[in-house]
C-alpha cells in the first residue's frame, strides 16, 4: 500500500463524525422532503440538532406538524408580530449564531429557498464550518453558490409525492448530457488534477473533498446518489478499485 494512501486511511479512521445542526425555514420548503434531507445528511454525520422555525399557529404549517415527532424535530415558535413581515428569518439567524458560538456543532444544514440567508452562510463559513443547503429549484443562485453542497429538494421527494415534471428531473443524466455540461466537466477534471498523486491517480474521497470545498456541487442534482456513480457515467476517467474494492481511484482518461 502506498504510504500516502495508508496515512489517508488512518486520518479517516480517527475522524469523529460531524455533529450537524439542521435549521428549517418551514415557510419556504416542503415538509415532504424532510426524509430525503435527513438521509442525505447521514452521509456527513449525525444531525443532533433539528430545529424547525415558523409560526405554528399558521394553517400553512400543518403538514410540518405531522413530521416533527417522527423525526425528532424541535418546533421553534416565531409569532408574526407585524403583518407582511417575516420574523422567522431573524429568529433562525439568531438560533444559528447561538449554536455557532456554543461550539457544540461541527457543521450546519439550512433547509430554505430564501437567499436572505446568504450572509449567514458566509459568516458560518468564516468560522471554518461547512454549510449544507437544501431548497427548491427557484432558490436564488447566490445562496446556492454559498453552500457546499446545495441539493434541490425536488430530487429528494418521494416518487409518489412528485409531480410529473419532477420525475423527469430525477432521471439520471446520461453520458452525452453530462459531457455537454462544460462547468461540470471542468470541475471534475480540475478536482482530479488538484488531488492526484504523481502518477495521475486520485482517491475519490479527496476529489469529493476538493469539490465540496470549492463549489456547491451535489451528484444528486444530476440524478446520482454518489459521486463515484456520476464519474463512471461521464466515461471521462479511468477507474481503479483498490483495497479489495473499498477504495476508488480515478485518473483523467486523456492522460
Where are the language model's segments positioned?
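Helical mechanochemical/support elements of P-loop NTPase systems and associated helical scaffolds
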Residues: 22, 30-33, 60-64, 88-92, ...
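Domain-level signal for Mg2+-assisted phosphodiester chemistry and nucleotide/NA-binding surfaces
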Residues: 2-95, 100-101, 130
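Intrinsically disordered, low-complexity glycine/proline-rich and charged
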Residues: 122-162, 237-248
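Intrinsically disordered, low-complexity linkers and terminal tails enriched in Pro/Gly
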Residues: 2-17, 156-180
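Short, ordered loop/turn segments at secondary-structure junctions
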Residues: 26, 80-81, 113, 136-137, ...
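Solvent-exposed alpha-helical segments within well-ordered globular domains of core cellular machineries
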Residues: 35-39, 66, 70, 94, ...
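Acidic beta-strand-to-loop metal/phosphate-binding motif
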Residues: 53, 106-113, 120, 124, ...
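N-terminal regulatory modules in eukaryotic regulatory proteins
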Residues: 137, 162, 166-255
Amino acid at each position: 500500500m502506498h504510504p500516502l494512501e495508508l496515512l489517508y486511511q488512518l486520518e479517516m479512521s480517527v475522524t469523529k463524525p460531524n455533529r450537524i445542526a439542521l435549521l428549517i425555514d418551514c415557510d419556504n420548503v416542503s415538509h415532504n422532503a424532510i426524509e430525503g434531507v435527513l438521509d442525505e445528511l447521514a452521509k456527513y454525520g449525525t444531525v443532533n440538532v433539528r430545529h424547525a422555525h415558523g409560526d405554528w399557529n399558521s394553517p400553512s404549517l400543518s403538514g410540518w406538524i405531522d413530521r416533527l415527532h417522527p423525526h425528532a424535530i424541535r418546533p421553534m415558535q416565531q409569532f408574526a408580530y407585524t403583518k407582511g413581515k417575516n420574523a422567522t428569518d431573524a429568529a433562525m439567524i439568531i438560533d444559528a449564531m447561538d449554536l455557532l458560538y456554543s461550539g457544540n456543532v461541527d457543521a450546519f444544514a439550512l433547509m430554505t429557498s430564501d437567499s436572505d440567508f446568504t450572509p449567514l452562510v458566509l459568516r458560518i463559513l468564516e468560522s471554518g464550518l461547512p454549510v449544507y443547503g437544501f431548497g427548491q429549484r427557484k432558490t436564488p443562485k447566490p445562496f446556492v453558490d454559498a453552500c457546499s453542497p446545495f441539493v434541490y429538494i425536488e430530487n429528494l421527494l418521494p416518487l409518489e409525492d412528485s409531480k410529473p415534471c419532477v420525475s423527469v428531473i430525477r432521471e439520471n443524466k446520461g453520458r452525452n448530457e453530462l459531457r455537454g455540461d462544460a462547468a461540470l466537466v471542468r470541475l471534475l477534471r480540475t478536482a482530479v488534477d488538484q488531488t492526484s498523486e504523481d502518477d495521475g491517480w486520485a482517491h475519490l474521497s479527496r476529489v469529493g473533498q476538493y469539490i465540496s470545498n470549492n463549489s456547491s456541487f451535489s451528484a444528486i442534482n444530476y440524478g446520482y446518489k454518489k459521486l463515484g456513480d456520476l464519474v463512471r457515467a461521464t466515461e471521462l476517467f479511468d477507474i481503479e478499485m483498490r483495497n479489495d474494492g473499498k477504495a476508488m481511484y480515478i485518473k483523467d482518461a486523456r492522460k
